Protein backbone atom coordinates (compact mmCIF):
# COMPACT_ATOMS: atom_id res chain seq x y z
CA UNK A 1 0.00 0.00 0.00
CA UNK A 2 1.58 3.29 -1.12
CA UNK A 3 1.66 6.46 1.00
CA UNK A 4 -1.14 9.02 0.75
CA UNK A 5 -0.34 11.63 -1.95
CA UNK A 6 1.03 14.84 -0.47
CA UNK A 7 1.82 18.24 -1.92
CA UNK A 8 5.46 18.57 -2.94
CA UNK A 9 7.46 21.07 -0.86
CA UNK A 10 8.85 23.13 -3.73
CA UNK A 11 8.34 24.94 -6.95
CA UNK A 12 11.15 24.55 -9.42
CA UNK A 13 11.25 28.32 -9.84
CA UNK A 14 12.62 28.60 -6.29
CA UNK A 15 14.85 25.55 -6.53
CA UNK A 16 18.15 27.45 -6.56
CA UNK A 17 17.54 28.99 -3.16
CA UNK A 18 16.75 25.61 -1.64
CA UNK A 19 19.80 23.95 -3.16
CA UNK A 20 22.11 26.43 -1.46
CA UNK A 21 21.29 24.68 1.83
CA UNK A 22 22.11 21.20 0.60
CA UNK A 23 25.43 19.65 1.62
CA UNK A 24 26.80 17.77 -1.34
CA UNK A 25 28.16 14.93 0.78
CA UNK A 26 25.31 14.20 3.18
CA UNK A 27 26.34 13.57 6.76
CA UNK A 28 25.63 10.04 8.00
CA UNK A 29 24.35 9.42 11.50
CA UNK A 30 26.68 10.75 14.26
CA UNK A 31 28.85 12.32 11.55
CA UNK A 32 31.76 14.63 12.19
CA UNK A 33 32.28 17.61 9.93
CA UNK A 34 32.37 16.26 6.36
CA UNK A 35 35.29 16.75 4.04
CA UNK A 36 35.30 20.00 2.07
CA UNK A 37 32.81 19.68 -0.77
CA UNK A 38 33.17 21.00 -4.27
CA UNK A 39 31.46 24.24 -5.26
CA UNK A 40 27.95 23.37 -6.42
CA UNK A 41 26.94 24.61 -9.86
CA UNK A 42 23.21 25.26 -9.41
CA UNK A 43 22.67 25.02 -13.16
CA UNK A 44 24.42 21.67 -13.51
CA UNK A 45 22.45 18.40 -13.51
CA UNK A 46 22.08 16.76 -10.12
CA UNK A 47 24.55 13.91 -9.63
CA UNK A 48 23.12 10.70 -8.22
CA UNK A 49 26.55 9.45 -7.12
CA UNK A 50 27.79 12.67 -5.51
CA UNK A 51 24.58 14.26 -4.22
CA UNK A 52 21.68 11.80 -4.01
CA UNK A 53 23.39 8.56 -2.97
CA UNK A 54 24.97 10.09 0.18
CA UNK A 55 21.51 11.18 1.38
CA UNK A 56 20.13 7.67 0.87
CA UNK A 57 23.23 6.12 2.45
CA UNK A 58 22.89 8.23 5.60
CA UNK A 59 19.14 7.94 6.05
CA UNK A 60 17.68 4.99 4.15
CA UNK A 61 20.07 2.16 3.33
CA UNK A 62 20.25 0.82 6.87
CA UNK A 63 16.72 -0.56 6.41
CA UNK A 64 16.71 -0.98 2.63
CA UNK A 65 19.68 -3.14 1.63
CA UNK A 66 19.97 -6.76 0.48
CA UNK A 67 20.60 -8.03 4.02
CA UNK A 68 17.61 -6.10 5.39
CA UNK A 69 15.09 -5.17 2.71
CA UNK A 70 12.09 -3.74 4.56
CA UNK A 71 9.02 -3.87 2.36
CA UNK A 72 11.09 -5.71 -0.23
CA UNK A 73 12.70 -2.40 -1.18
CA UNK A 74 16.48 -2.21 -1.79
CA UNK A 75 18.14 1.19 -2.20
CA UNK A 76 21.77 0.10 -2.54
CA UNK A 77 21.24 -1.22 -6.08
CA UNK A 78 20.20 1.43 -8.61
CA UNK A 79 17.83 -0.77 -10.62
CA UNK A 80 16.02 -1.91 -7.46
CA UNK A 81 15.98 1.67 -6.16
CA UNK A 82 13.82 2.68 -9.12
CA UNK A 83 11.75 -0.50 -9.18
CA UNK A 84 10.24 -0.26 -5.69
CA UNK A 85 9.31 -3.02 -3.29
CA UNK A 86 6.55 -5.48 -2.48
CA UNK A 87 3.76 -3.17 -3.65
CA UNK A 88 4.82 -3.71 -7.24
CA UNK A 89 4.65 0.02 -7.92
CA UNK A 90 7.73 1.83 -9.21
CA UNK A 91 9.31 3.95 -6.48
CA UNK A 92 10.84 6.40 -8.94
CA UNK A 93 9.21 7.55 -12.16
CA UNK A 94 11.87 9.38 -14.20
CA UNK A 95 10.92 12.96 -15.14
CA UNK A 96 7.83 12.79 -12.88
CA UNK A 97 8.67 13.49 -9.22
CA UNK A 98 5.02 14.23 -8.41
CA UNK A 99 4.13 10.67 -9.47
CA UNK A 100 7.11 9.03 -7.73
CA UNK A 101 6.06 7.30 -4.46
CA UNK A 102 9.60 7.78 -3.11
CA UNK A 103 9.16 11.56 -3.16
CA UNK A 104 5.72 11.26 -1.57
CA UNK A 105 7.12 9.09 1.22
CA UNK A 106 9.89 11.53 2.17
CA UNK A 107 7.82 14.72 1.88
CA UNK A 108 6.62 16.38 5.07
CA UNK A 109 2.86 16.59 5.53
CA UNK A 110 1.53 18.27 8.66
CA UNK A 111 5.00 18.05 10.18
CA UNK A 112 5.58 14.34 9.52
CA UNK A 113 6.96 12.11 6.78
CA UNK A 114 6.36 8.41 6.16
CA UNK A 115 10.06 7.80 5.62
CA UNK A 116 12.65 7.32 6.98
CA UNK A 117 10.91 5.30 9.70
CA UNK A 118 11.95 6.14 13.24
CA UNK A 119 14.39 8.83 12.11
CA UNK A 120 14.22 12.59 11.64
CA UNK A 121 12.68 13.47 8.26
CA UNK A 122 14.86 14.61 5.42
CA UNK A 123 15.34 18.35 5.21
CA UNK A 124 13.36 20.34 2.68
CA UNK A 125 16.48 21.03 0.58
CA UNK A 126 17.27 17.30 0.52
CA UNK A 127 13.76 16.43 -0.64
CA UNK A 128 13.94 19.21 -3.23
CA UNK A 129 17.26 17.91 -4.52
CA UNK A 130 15.90 14.37 -4.89
CA UNK A 131 12.85 15.69 -6.73
CA UNK A 132 15.05 17.72 -9.09
CA UNK A 133 17.17 14.64 -9.81
CA UNK A 134 14.02 12.68 -10.70
CA UNK A 135 12.68 15.56 -12.82
CA UNK A 136 15.94 15.50 -14.78
CA UNK A 137 15.39 11.82 -15.56
CA UNK A 138 16.81 10.04 -12.49
CA UNK A 139 20.13 9.46 -14.25
CA UNK A 140 22.59 6.95 -12.78
CA UNK A 141 26.13 8.34 -12.93
CA UNK A 142 27.68 5.72 -10.64
CA UNK A 143 31.29 5.01 -11.71
CA UNK A 144 31.64 1.53 -13.18
CA UNK A 145 34.26 0.56 -10.63
CA UNK A 146 31.96 1.55 -7.75
CA UNK A 147 29.01 -0.68 -8.61
CA UNK A 148 28.26 -3.06 -5.74
CA UNK A 149 28.70 -6.71 -6.76
CA UNK A 150 28.46 -8.40 -3.37
CA UNK A 151 25.41 -9.41 -1.34
CA UNK A 152 24.07 -12.58 0.29
CA UNK A 153 23.08 -13.98 -3.10
CA UNK A 154 26.52 -13.11 -4.49
CA UNK A 155 28.93 -13.59 -1.56
CA UNK A 156 32.63 -12.72 -1.77
CA UNK A 157 34.83 -15.00 -3.86
CA UNK A 158 38.29 -15.49 -2.39
CA UNK A 159 41.53 -16.38 -4.13
CA UNK A 160 43.30 -16.23 -0.77
CA UNK A 161 42.22 -15.68 2.79
CA UNK A 162 42.18 -11.99 3.77
CA UNK A 163 43.84 -10.58 6.87
CA UNK A 164 41.65 -11.26 9.90
CA UNK A 165 41.01 -8.35 12.25
CA UNK A 166 38.63 -9.87 14.81
CA UNK A 167 37.40 -13.14 16.34
CA UNK A 168 34.84 -14.05 18.99
CA UNK A 169 33.40 -17.26 20.45
CA UNK A 170 29.69 -17.45 21.20
CA UNK A 171 28.96 -17.66 24.95
CA UNK A 172 27.77 -21.28 24.63
CA UNK A 173 31.03 -22.25 22.93
CA UNK A 174 29.38 -23.56 19.77
CA UNK A 175 30.31 -20.86 17.25
CA UNK A 176 33.36 -18.85 16.28
CA UNK A 177 32.75 -15.56 14.45
CA UNK A 178 35.55 -14.55 12.06
CA UNK A 179 35.88 -11.18 10.32
CA UNK A 180 36.11 -11.53 6.53
CA UNK A 181 35.79 -9.21 3.55
CA UNK A 182 32.26 -7.80 3.27
CA UNK A 183 31.07 -10.47 5.70
CA UNK A 184 31.38 -12.26 9.01
CA UNK A 185 31.87 -16.01 8.79
CA UNK A 186 30.31 -18.20 11.48
CA UNK A 187 32.24 -21.43 12.06
CA UNK A 188 31.83 -24.38 14.35
CA UNK A 189 33.95 -23.48 17.35
CA UNK A 190 36.27 -26.46 16.82
CA UNK A 191 37.08 -25.31 13.29
CA UNK A 192 35.31 -28.29 11.73
CA UNK A 193 33.30 -26.30 9.21
CA UNK A 194 31.55 -23.14 8.05
CA UNK A 195 28.03 -22.65 9.45
CA UNK A 196 26.88 -19.36 7.90
CA UNK A 197 28.02 -16.25 6.04
CA UNK A 198 26.64 -12.89 7.20
CA UNK A 199 27.12 -10.61 4.18
CA UNK A 200 26.41 -6.90 4.66
CA UNK A 201 27.27 -3.50 3.21
CA UNK A 202 30.60 -2.98 4.96
CA UNK A 203 33.64 -4.02 2.96
CA UNK A 204 35.97 -3.88 5.92
CA UNK A 205 35.05 -5.67 9.13
CA UNK A 206 37.07 -4.33 12.07
CA UNK A 207 35.40 -5.90 15.11
CA UNK A 208 32.88 -8.65 15.95
CA UNK A 209 31.29 -9.45 19.33
CA UNK A 210 28.50 -11.78 20.43
CA UNK A 211 25.88 -10.37 22.79
CA UNK A 212 26.02 -11.61 26.40
CA UNK A 213 23.21 -14.10 25.71
CA UNK A 214 24.68 -15.15 22.35
CA UNK A 215 21.53 -14.40 20.34
CA UNK A 216 22.98 -11.41 18.47
CA UNK A 217 26.26 -10.43 16.88
CA UNK A 218 27.53 -6.84 16.75
CA UNK A 219 29.83 -5.89 13.88
CA UNK A 220 31.84 -2.68 13.45
CA UNK A 221 33.38 -1.71 10.14
CA UNK A 222 32.46 0.24 7.04
CA UNK A 223 33.56 1.42 3.63
CA UNK A 224 37.06 2.87 4.07
CA UNK A 225 37.17 6.67 3.67
CA UNK A 226 33.45 6.70 2.82
CA UNK A 227 31.27 5.40 5.65
CA UNK A 228 31.35 3.63 8.98
CA UNK A 229 28.68 1.10 9.93
CA UNK A 230 27.53 -0.87 12.95
CA UNK A 231 25.57 -4.03 12.15
CA UNK A 232 23.54 -6.16 14.55
CA UNK A 233 22.68 -9.68 13.37
CA UNK A 234 20.22 -12.25 14.67
CA UNK A 235 22.51 -15.25 15.13
CA UNK A 236 19.76 -17.86 15.00
CA UNK A 237 17.91 -16.50 11.96
CA UNK A 238 21.13 -15.27 10.27
CA UNK A 239 19.38 -11.97 9.48
CA UNK A 240 20.45 -8.35 9.83
CA UNK A 241 18.38 -6.64 12.52
CA UNK A 242 19.95 -3.18 12.73
CA UNK A 243 22.31 -1.25 10.45
CA UNK A 244 23.56 2.17 11.56
CA UNK A 245 25.71 4.36 9.27
CA UNK A 246 28.34 6.30 11.22
CA UNK A 247 30.62 9.05 9.96
CA UNK A 248 32.96 8.97 6.98
CA UNK A 249 35.31 6.06 7.75
CA UNK A 250 35.34 2.60 9.31
CA UNK A 251 34.58 2.21 13.02
CA UNK A 252 36.29 0.00 15.60
CA UNK A 253 36.25 -1.84 18.91
CA UNK A 254 32.62 -2.87 19.30
CA UNK A 255 31.41 -4.04 22.74
CA UNK A 256 28.13 -4.87 24.52
CA UNK A 257 26.86 -3.58 27.83
CA UNK A 258 26.42 -6.41 30.39
CA UNK A 259 22.62 -6.32 29.99
CA UNK A 260 22.85 -6.43 26.19
CA UNK A 261 20.97 -3.15 25.75
CA UNK A 262 23.79 -0.93 24.51
CA UNK A 263 26.59 -1.27 21.98
CA UNK A 264 29.72 0.88 22.17
CA UNK A 265 32.34 1.50 19.50
CA UNK A 266 35.16 3.86 18.59
CA UNK A 267 35.52 6.17 15.63
CA UNK A 268 38.36 7.75 13.64
CA UNK A 269 36.84 11.19 14.29
CA UNK A 270 38.18 10.76 17.87
CA UNK A 271 34.72 10.07 19.30
CA UNK A 272 33.52 7.28 21.58
CA UNK A 273 29.90 6.39 20.80
CA UNK A 274 27.16 4.04 21.95
CA UNK A 275 23.79 3.09 20.47
CA UNK A 276 20.64 1.33 21.60
CA UNK A 277 21.06 -2.30 20.50
CA UNK A 278 17.37 -2.67 19.66
CA UNK A 279 16.81 0.51 17.65
CA UNK A 280 20.24 1.83 16.68
CA UNK A 281 19.41 5.15 18.32
CA UNK A 282 22.40 7.17 19.55
CA UNK A 283 22.69 7.24 23.35
CA UNK A 284 26.29 8.41 23.92
CA UNK A 285 28.91 10.53 22.20
CA UNK A 286 32.09 11.54 24.01
CA UNK A 287 34.91 13.46 22.38
CA UNK A 288 37.63 13.44 25.03
CA UNK A 289 40.10 11.43 22.90
CA UNK A 290 42.53 13.34 20.68
CA UNK A 291 43.03 10.54 18.14
CA UNK A 292 41.21 7.47 16.79
CA UNK A 293 39.28 5.42 19.35
CA UNK A 294 40.14 1.75 18.74
CA UNK A 295 38.74 -0.24 21.66
CA UNK A 296 35.82 -0.11 24.11
CA UNK A 297 34.54 -2.12 27.08
CA UNK A 298 31.85 -1.59 29.74
CA UNK A 299 32.51 -1.98 33.45
CA UNK A 300 30.77 -4.74 35.44
CA UNK A 301 27.43 -3.01 36.00
CA UNK A 302 27.38 -1.11 32.69
CA UNK A 303 27.36 2.30 34.35
CA UNK A 304 30.71 3.30 32.85
CA UNK A 305 32.48 2.84 29.53
CA UNK A 306 36.23 2.53 29.07
CA UNK A 307 37.97 3.33 25.79
CA UNK A 308 41.49 3.21 24.37
CA UNK A 309 42.92 4.95 21.35
CA UNK A 310 45.85 6.10 19.30
CA UNK A 311 46.29 9.06 21.65
CA UNK A 312 47.98 6.73 24.19
CA UNK A 313 45.15 7.03 26.70
CA UNK A 314 42.60 4.88 28.52
CA UNK A 315 39.55 7.00 29.29
CA UNK A 316 36.59 6.53 31.62
CA UNK A 317 33.12 7.81 30.68
CA UNK A 318 29.89 7.74 32.68
CA UNK A 319 27.19 6.29 30.43
CA UNK A 320 24.09 8.01 31.81
CA UNK A 321 25.52 11.52 31.67
CA UNK A 322 27.98 10.97 28.77
CA UNK A 323 30.50 12.69 31.05
CA UNK A 324 34.24 12.16 30.81
CA UNK A 325 35.41 11.07 34.27
CA UNK A 326 39.10 10.24 34.25
CA UNK A 327 42.22 9.15 32.43
CA UNK A 328 42.72 5.66 33.83
CA UNK A 329 46.24 5.13 32.53
CA UNK A 330 48.96 7.72 32.95
CA UNK A 331 48.98 10.59 30.46
CA UNK A 332 52.50 11.62 31.41
CA UNK A 333 54.73 11.72 28.30
CA UNK A 334 56.77 8.53 28.13
CA UNK A 335 54.54 6.51 30.47
CA UNK A 336 53.07 4.77 27.42
CA UNK A 337 55.22 4.64 24.31
CA UNK A 338 52.64 4.71 21.53
CA UNK A 339 48.94 4.23 20.90
CA UNK A 340 46.67 1.68 22.55
CA UNK A 341 44.93 -0.86 20.33
CA UNK A 342 43.20 -3.35 22.61
CA UNK A 343 41.22 -3.64 25.84
CA UNK A 344 39.52 -6.43 27.82
CA UNK A 345 37.92 -6.53 31.27
CA UNK A 346 39.08 -8.85 34.04
CA UNK A 347 36.13 -11.17 34.84
CA UNK A 348 34.32 -10.30 38.05
CA UNK A 349 36.31 -7.13 38.65
CA UNK A 350 36.34 -3.49 37.60
CA UNK A 351 39.81 -3.86 36.12
CA UNK A 352 40.89 -3.58 32.49
CA UNK A 353 43.72 -5.16 30.53
CA UNK A 354 45.19 -2.95 27.82
CA UNK A 355 47.80 -3.37 25.10
CA UNK A 356 49.38 -1.25 22.40
CA UNK A 357 52.46 -0.02 20.63
CA UNK A 358 54.89 -0.51 23.51
CA UNK A 359 54.28 -4.27 23.60
CA UNK A 360 53.57 -4.42 27.35
CA UNK A 361 50.17 -5.77 28.49
CA UNK A 362 49.05 -3.82 31.55
CA UNK A 363 46.20 -4.17 34.04
CA UNK A 364 44.52 -1.11 35.53
CA UNK A 365 41.80 -0.52 38.09
CA UNK A 366 38.90 1.41 36.56
CA UNK A 367 38.08 3.62 39.54
CA UNK A 368 40.98 5.38 41.24
CA UNK A 369 41.39 5.24 45.02
CA UNK A 370 43.48 8.39 45.33
CA UNK A 371 43.31 11.88 43.91
CA UNK A 372 45.16 12.27 40.61
CA UNK A 373 48.53 13.91 40.95
CA UNK A 374 50.87 15.15 38.26
CA UNK A 375 52.79 12.30 36.66
CA UNK A 376 51.15 9.49 38.62
CA UNK A 377 50.22 6.05 37.32
CA UNK A 378 48.25 5.17 40.45
CA UNK A 379 45.70 2.92 38.75
CA UNK A 380 48.32 0.47 37.46
CA UNK A 381 47.92 -2.98 39.03
CA UNK A 382 50.15 -5.25 36.92
CA UNK A 383 52.69 -5.15 34.11
CA UNK A 384 53.16 -8.38 32.17
CA UNK A 385 56.38 -9.46 30.44
CA UNK A 386 56.87 -7.48 27.23
CA UNK A 387 56.20 -8.84 23.76
CA UNK A 388 58.16 -8.16 20.60
CA UNK A 389 56.38 -5.53 18.49
CA UNK A 390 52.97 -3.92 18.86
CA UNK A 391 50.11 -5.54 20.72
CA UNK A 392 46.91 -5.66 18.66
CA UNK A 393 44.72 -7.91 20.82
CA UNK A 394 44.31 -8.90 24.47
CA UNK A 395 41.87 -11.19 26.25
CA UNK A 396 41.05 -12.71 29.64
CA UNK A 397 39.79 -16.27 30.03
CA UNK A 398 36.24 -16.48 31.37
CA UNK A 399 37.40 -17.86 34.74
CA UNK A 400 40.01 -15.10 35.07
CA UNK A 401 42.90 -17.53 35.39
CA UNK A 402 44.65 -16.72 32.11
CA UNK A 403 45.66 -13.60 30.20
CA UNK A 404 46.55 -13.57 26.49
CA UNK A 405 48.09 -10.98 24.21
CA UNK A 406 48.95 -10.98 20.50
CA UNK A 407 51.52 -8.92 18.63
CA UNK A 408 53.02 -8.15 15.25
CA UNK A 409 56.63 -7.30 14.42
CA UNK A 410 58.39 -7.21 11.04
CA UNK A 411 56.07 -9.75 9.43
CA UNK A 412 56.12 -12.08 12.42
CA UNK A 413 53.47 -12.71 15.03
CA UNK A 414 53.34 -14.02 18.57
CA UNK A 415 50.79 -15.05 21.17
CA UNK A 416 51.68 -14.94 24.87
CA UNK A 417 49.82 -16.68 27.67
CA UNK A 418 50.25 -15.33 31.19
CA UNK A 419 48.98 -16.12 34.65
CA UNK A 420 45.83 -14.14 35.38
CA UNK A 421 45.30 -14.94 39.05
CA UNK A 422 46.81 -12.61 41.66
CA UNK A 423 45.87 -10.26 44.46
CA UNK A 424 45.43 -6.84 42.86
CA UNK A 425 44.80 -4.92 46.09
CA UNK A 426 47.12 -1.91 46.16
CA UNK A 427 49.26 -1.92 49.35
CA UNK A 428 48.58 0.83 51.87
CA UNK A 429 52.13 2.13 51.59
CA UNK A 430 51.57 2.81 47.89
CA UNK A 431 48.14 4.36 48.42
CA UNK A 432 49.77 6.76 50.87
CA UNK A 433 52.55 7.62 48.42
CA UNK A 434 50.05 8.15 45.58
CA UNK A 435 47.91 10.38 47.82
CA UNK A 436 50.70 12.48 49.32
CA UNK A 437 53.26 12.95 46.55
CA UNK A 438 53.74 13.70 42.90
CA UNK A 439 55.51 10.93 41.01
CA UNK A 440 58.87 12.72 40.89
CA UNK A 441 58.91 12.86 44.71
CA UNK A 442 58.62 9.11 45.31
CA UNK A 443 61.45 7.72 47.40
CA UNK A 444 63.77 4.99 46.17
CA UNK A 445 61.95 2.54 48.45
CA UNK A 446 58.53 3.59 47.14
CA UNK A 447 59.65 3.18 43.54
CA UNK A 448 60.96 -0.29 44.37
CA UNK A 449 57.66 -1.18 46.03
CA UNK A 450 55.72 -0.02 42.95
CA UNK A 451 57.89 -2.26 40.75
CA UNK A 452 57.54 -5.19 43.15
CA UNK A 453 53.75 -4.86 43.38
CA UNK A 454 53.07 -4.35 39.66
CA UNK A 455 55.10 -7.45 38.69
CA UNK A 456 54.16 -9.76 41.58
CA UNK A 457 52.76 -13.21 40.73
CA UNK A 458 52.96 -12.44 37.01
CA UNK A 459 54.40 -15.22 34.89
CA UNK A 460 54.73 -15.98 31.18
CA UNK A 461 53.27 -19.47 30.71
CA UNK A 462 53.72 -19.96 26.96
CA UNK A 463 54.89 -18.07 23.89
CA UNK A 464 53.66 -19.19 20.47
CA UNK A 465 55.48 -17.84 17.41
CA UNK A 466 53.39 -17.60 14.23
CA UNK A 467 53.74 -16.57 10.60
CA UNK A 468 52.51 -13.03 10.01
CA UNK A 469 51.30 -10.47 12.50
CA UNK A 470 48.46 -11.49 14.85
CA UNK A 471 45.58 -9.02 15.13
CA UNK A 472 42.81 -11.01 16.82
CA UNK A 473 42.45 -13.22 19.91
CA UNK A 474 39.60 -14.96 21.72
CA UNK A 475 39.49 -17.52 24.53
CA UNK A 476 37.00 -20.35 24.13
CA UNK A 477 34.38 -20.25 26.92
CA UNK A 478 35.78 -23.43 28.48
CA UNK A 479 39.26 -21.90 28.54
CA UNK A 480 40.87 -24.86 26.79
CA UNK A 481 41.74 -23.08 23.54
CA UNK A 482 42.70 -19.66 22.32
CA UNK A 483 41.76 -18.65 18.77
CA UNK A 484 44.33 -16.41 17.08
CA UNK A 485 44.38 -14.90 13.59
CA UNK A 486 45.87 -12.06 11.62
CA UNK A 487 47.91 -11.14 8.58
CA UNK A 488 48.12 -14.50 6.81
CA UNK A 489 44.36 -15.19 7.01
CA UNK A 490 44.67 -18.43 8.98
CA UNK A 491 42.83 -19.19 12.23
CA UNK A 492 44.83 -21.13 14.80
CA UNK A 493 43.33 -22.86 17.80
CA UNK A 494 46.07 -22.84 20.43
CA UNK A 495 45.96 -25.03 23.53
CA UNK A 496 46.08 -23.07 26.77
CA UNK A 497 47.96 -25.84 28.57
CA UNK A 498 51.09 -25.69 26.44
CA UNK A 499 50.66 -23.04 23.77
CA UNK A 500 50.72 -25.54 20.90
CA UNK A 501 48.66 -25.14 17.73
CA UNK A 502 45.95 -27.81 17.84
CA UNK A 503 44.26 -26.74 14.61
CA UNK A 504 45.09 -24.41 11.73
CA UNK A 505 42.43 -23.61 9.14
CA UNK A 506 41.47 -21.07 6.48
CA UNK A 507 38.04 -19.65 7.42
CA UNK A 508 36.93 -18.51 3.95
CA UNK A 509 35.87 -20.71 1.03
CA UNK A 510 38.54 -20.44 -1.66
CA UNK A 511 37.71 -20.35 -5.36
CA UNK A 512 38.70 -23.51 -7.20
CA UNK A 513 39.80 -21.61 -10.31
CA UNK A 514 41.35 -18.22 -10.82
CA UNK A 515 39.00 -15.33 -11.51
CA UNK A 516 39.22 -13.59 -14.85
CA UNK A 517 39.93 -9.89 -14.70
CA UNK A 518 36.82 -7.70 -14.95
CA UNK A 519 36.68 -5.42 -17.93
Where are these predicted regions, by residue range?
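N-terminal secretory signal peptides that target proteins for export/translocation
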Residues: 1-12
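WD40-repeat beta-propeller superdomains and closely related acidic/aromatic-rich repeat-like regions
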Residues: 141-519
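Bacterial N-terminal signal peptides
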Residues: 13-27
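N-terminal leader/targeting signatures
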Residues: 6-8, 26, 501
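Generic detector of N-terminal low-structure segments
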Residues: 12-14, 32, 212, 300
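Aromatic- and Gly/Pro-enriched helix-to-coil junctions and flexible linker segments
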Residues: 28-171, 180-181
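Residue-level detector of alpha-helical hydrophobic segments embedded in or interacting with membranes
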Residues: 2-4, 23, 29-30, 49, ...
